[in-house]
Regions:
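Conserved Rossmann-fold NAD(P)-dependent oxidoreductase catalytic core, especially the SDR/UDP-sugar
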Residues: 74, 78, 83-143
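Glycine/proline-rich active-site loop of Rossmann-fold NAD(P)-dependent oxidoreductases
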Residues: 162-166, 177-189, 221-231, 254
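A conserved pocket-lining segment of Rossmann-fold NAD(P)-dependent short-chain dehydrogenase/reductase
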Residues: 83-84, 138-142, 181-182, 188-209, ...
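NAD(P)H-binding glycine-rich loop region in Rossmannoid oxidoreductase-like domains
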Residues: 35-96
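N-terminal Rossmann NAD(P)H-binding glycine-rich loop of SDR-like oxidoreductase domains
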Residues: 2-26
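Mid/C-terminal beta-alpha module of Rossmann-like enzyme folds, strongest
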Residues: 3, 217-285, 302, 307-308
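Active-site Tyr-X1-5-Lys
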Residues: 141-168
């Protein structure tokens, strides 16, 4: 069970998973789409993993990397909130790419698969802010990323039922913490905050979890033979105002905002950003993101991961 593949190993979660696996004595084959790009491989080379080139949208590249492996950590996915063609650039790679990886693993006889999903496939909170659990699904979402993660996970479970693949799913909230080599939609807001680029505090509550804890959840799921199903990973849900206050306490010299933005102001900004995107600029905020995330309670029940996996 010690020979594993980690897809998307140059990303924040993928790298953190690969790093922990190496520390626990695993033989790790880490996949990247372009093994000739030092930006994608230098940090992996330092771990001492085997680097393999594979593209989830090209099934012929996946078969060789699955050969002789005991397990797969299917982490690779598109993490973007906006694209000019969301179906082609976000949705299809997540859904089709994920199934391609699972199919290649099944064909190669890989014993167990840990599939990285997200709480984007779960939702934000129940009625009156009640915590959501693994029983909840974000099926009504039309946000490109949330829709892609929800549908990709549904397809993964359908394939596992049809094929008999031993599948477990990890559903983390927004992943922060060290060991990212480029910013993600989860870390970028903190870069803006620390640079003094936020003029108002957005009306949003973040579900947060450290990348190292997410990696631990993945590895525990793989190693816990009785584990089944989905597992939500969230350390805490904090309103943006509390996060800003924490930054202010840590370093009072950072020019953090002091006033909260009204939801109507954020909606207006998203519309303006959408208008600008028609002229070639990537928007910092979209109306779909506002509808999906802002002005809503956020709460998750993580008792299953703690009870079943011994997580954190």
């Amino acid at each position: 069970m010690k020979r594993v593949v980690v897809t998307g190993a140059n990303g924040h979660v993928g790298y953190s998973v690969a790093k922990l696996l190496v520390a626990r004595g695993y033989d790790v084959r880490a996949t990247v789409r372009d093994a000739s790009d030092p930006a994608k491989t230098t940090h992996l080379e330092a771990l001492g993993v085997e680097i393999a080139q594979a593209d989830l949208m090209r099934p012929e590249t996946l078969a060789p990397v699955m050969e002789g492996r005991d397990g797969l950590f299917q982490v690779a996915a598109v993490y973007r909130s906006w694209a000019r063609d969301p179906q082609r650039e976000i949705i299809e790679p997540s859904i089709t790419g994920g199934i391609n990886a699972l199919r290649a693993a099944h064909t190669a006889g890989v014993g167990r698969v840990v599939f990285t999903s997200s709480t984007a496939a779960v939702g934000r909170a129940g009625p009156d802010g009640a915590p959501l659990s693994e029983a909840d699904w974000n099926d009504a979402s039309r946000h490109p990323y949330s829709y892609a993660k929800t549908e990709a996970e549904h397809r993964a479970w359908a394939f596992a039922e049809e094929s008999g693949l031993d599948l477990l799913v990890i559903n983390p909230t927004a992943v922060i913490g060290p060991d990212f080599h480029r910013h993600t939609p989860s870390t970028a807001p903190y870069r803006m905050l620390l640079r003094g680029e936020l003029r108002r505090i957005p009306p949003i509550t973040y579900g947060l979890v450290d990348a190292r804890d997410v990696a631990q959840g993945h590895v525990l799921a793989y190693e816990t033979r009785q584990a089944r199903g989905r597992h939500i990973l969230c350390t805490e849900c904090l309103p943006a105002a509390e996060l800003v206050a924490l930054v202010r306490d840590i370093d009072p010299t950072i020019a953090v905002p002091t006033r909260q933005a009204a939801l109507w102001q954020v909606r207006a900004l998203a519309r303006l950003e959408q208008f600008r995107s028609w002229f070639g600029r990537e928007p910092r905020l979209t109306p779909e993101t506002v509808r999906e995330y802002l002005g809503k309670p956020t709460s998750y029940d993580t008792s299953k991961a703690r009870r079943e996996l011994g997580w954190c």
